[in-house]
Structures are given as C-alpha cells and as structure tokens.
C-alpha cells in the first residue's frame, strides 16, 4: 500500500532454477522504470530467440544489398509489441463467493495462536484458567456462544483478507507469457512464460462443486508468486467454462475429465488403509466416554461410504503425450494435467496386501515453484500403473 501512495512498485525477478528468494529484487522503483525494465527483459528474450534461430546462408546477392533488409527486420522486431488478450476476469459475485468459502479462517486462528505463544510470559494464564472454569460452571451454552463469536470474527477477517488479496483478479495472455494481476491495497503482477508451465491442477471442493465452481492451479518451474504461495490461475471459475478457458491458454493441451475408472477389486483397499487408526479410536472412545462413546460406532458406516466415494472418484487417462490423474483427498477432488516430458519422477508403491490384489498406487511428480507437485491415483490396477510408469520414465521420453 505504501508503494501505491508514492507511485512506486516492487520488482521480483525469478529464473526457472530459482529457489524462491529471487535473483533480483528491487524494493522500490518508479512505475516508468518498471515498465522500462520489463521492456528490456522482453527485448532480451526476443534477441536470444533470434540468435538461436538457424543461420540462413544466401548466395547470389551482394553483401551491401543485405544490410537494408537486416535493418528493417531488426527494427520491426524491436518495434513490434506483443498482443495481449484478457482471458479471465473475476466478477464481484465470484470474488465474494471465493472470500466467503475460502479456508482463511485457519490462517487467522493459527496466526493468533503464534502471537499468543510469542507473548505467553506476559499473559496471565492462571487468571484466564480460573475464568474458564467459572464459565464452565455457568453452563455450556455460554462457552459455546463465546467460541462461536470468536470463530465468526475470524471468519469475517478471513473474508476481508481474501477479498483484498484477489480484488480485480485478471488473467491475460500474449504470445509468450501468462500475465496475472490482482490486489486492492497491494497490487501484484505476475508474468509466467508459457515454456515454464509444467502442469495444471484442478481442485474441486465439494461445497463449491454443489454450486458449479472449482479452482485451477498453475504449476511452473521456478518461483513465480514472489512470496512462496501457490499460483492460482483461476481462484474460482465455473466448471462448465473451465475447459474452454484452459484450452484458450494452452491450445496444445486437452483438458477432458479422465475416463478410465478403477476396477471393483480395488475398492476394499480404500477401507483397509484407515483401519489401523479407526478401530483403536472407536475402542478408546467407548472405554473412556461411556455410554456416549458408543456413538463412535457410527464412524464405521461413514468410513465405508467415504471409501466408496474415493474409489468412485479416482480415475486416469493418457491422451497423446498427456497424462491425466485424478484422486480424492479427505473431501476435495484433485485432477492433474501434465505432459510426459514434464514428469520429473514416476513411482509405483505396493504393499504386501496390494501385491496380492494386483493393485498399486501411482505417483507422478512435476516441478512446481521451488518444490514439486504430485499427481496420484491410489489402488489402481497394477498393469495400468506400469503402463503409465514406463511411458513417463526418462528412458521413454
């Protein structure tokens, strides 16, 4: 915000192999200087491509006659401005929906907790503990009301933070880059070269999915956000428009829903993986909290339903040189779109029980900022897993 008051901007330049800290960081420069720096960088990229172009040897023409041609071509190349098209712009209604359904409340509460930990020696813990005991004696309704008020205030703060952060969110594209701008108090502009894009991940939250919205994340080589956060290509987009928008940005890729489902014999493995903690938890609740602990038995049918849901959601597909992997976490559905040559590592994991059922978990990792992003399909048929594995290993690229 201080930058905008004084007409200044902060420039963060990161290369593909950067660690996220930035090779060049200019804390405060004028807007005109920032535009000039951006123009110099783009001109350098164009000159680098001209040098990489194959050399053309022409015979039969005097050397002097070639000079005007070269001068005209160079002048046209420098003067030519890339055409920028606006692909996506978040509306106010979508921005409010994003703010109200975001998970920022967890960030607020964790920040308050860390703040209290830093100043714990100045906080009268015994006095607060005594007040809590007094409130517990007065009734659970008072305590529940206070907790609800605290969570409501934290939710209001998270809504405000998300709204300010993603205000005027716009995605543009020129011939070589994707340009993302957002922010109200602190306006940010991120430029991602198309050659550095490693994959696209679609995240479908069940609550947003009910009203037809989802989130699209862009994975790029090197840090591009400047502050270490993941880069949201479409923070909130209509599900029916997602494929059209992605195709306009990446015309060489396809973004269908994966068609190949998991076999029926892999369904029991989605249940077995959680038995090692679910059954001891139920036993402990029954032992320590009778008779209400018996209500925990209801977790068993809920677990069966959740496992069947995860099995039904998982799928995969290989489209030409692309790989599409889909799996469901605790609630959200994750779909990874990438190409074979972008895969950095492929892994198949098999337990003893999975070997008996001829199933395994396939995991593909791609570069994402300073780290890696993972696409996976759990408990898929081992033949299908090996087929994708051999196609994405370096020897097969």
Question: At which residue positions do the language-model features occur?
Answer:
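N-terminal basic, Ser/Thr-rich segments that initiate or prime the first beta/alpha elements at protein or domain
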Residues: 1-397
């Amino acid at each position: 915000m201080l930058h905008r008051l004084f007409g200044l901007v902060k420039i963060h330049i990161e290369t593909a192999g950067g660690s996220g800290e930035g090779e060049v960081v200019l804390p405060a420069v004028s807007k005109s200087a920032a535009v000039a720096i951006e123009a110099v960088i783009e001109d350098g990229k164009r000159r680098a491509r001209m040098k990489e172009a194959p050399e053309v040897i022409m015979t039969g023409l005097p050397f002097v006659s070639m000079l005007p041609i070269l001068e005209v071509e160079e002048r046209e190349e420098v003067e030519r401005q890339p055409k920028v098209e606006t692909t996506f712009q978040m509306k106010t209604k979508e921005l409010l929906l994003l703010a109200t359904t975001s998970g920022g409340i967890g960030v607020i509460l964790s920040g308050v907790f860390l703040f209290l930990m830093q100043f714990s020696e100045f906080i009268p813990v015994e006095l607060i503990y005594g007040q809590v005991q007094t409130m517990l004696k007065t009734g659970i309704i008072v305590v529940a009301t206070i907790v609800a008020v605290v969570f409501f205030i934290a939710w209001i703060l998270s809504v405000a933070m998300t709204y300010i952060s993603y205000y005027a969110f716009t995605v543009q594209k020129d011939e070589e880059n994707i340009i993302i701008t957002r922010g109200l108090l602190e306006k940010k502009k991120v430029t991602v070269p198309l050659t550095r894009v490693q994959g696209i991940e679609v995240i479908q939250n069940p609550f947003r999915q009910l009203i037809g919205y989802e989130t699209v994340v862009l994975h790029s080589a090197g840090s591009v956000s400047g502050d270490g956060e993941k880069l949201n290509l479409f923070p909130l987009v209509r599900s029916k428009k997602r494929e059209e928008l992605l195709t306009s940005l990446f015309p060489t890729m396809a973004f269908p829903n994966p068609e190949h489902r998991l076999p029926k014999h892999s369904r029991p493995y989605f249940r077995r993986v959680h038995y090692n903690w679910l059954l001891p938890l139920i036993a402990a609740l029954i032992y320590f909290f009778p008779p209400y602990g018996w209500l925990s038995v209801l977790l068993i049918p809920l677990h069966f339903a959740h496992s069947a849901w995860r099995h039904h959601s998982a799928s995969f597909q290989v489209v030409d040189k692309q790989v599409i992997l889909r799996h469901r976490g605790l609630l959200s559905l994750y779909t990874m779109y990438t190409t074979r040559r972008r895969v950095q590592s492929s892994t198949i994991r098999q337990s003893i029980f999975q070997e008996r059922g001829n199933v395994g978990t396939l995991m593909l990792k791609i570069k994402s900022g300073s780290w890696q992003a993972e696409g996976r399909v759990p408990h898929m048929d081992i033949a299908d897993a090996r087929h994708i594995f051999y196609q994405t290993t370096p020897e097969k690229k």
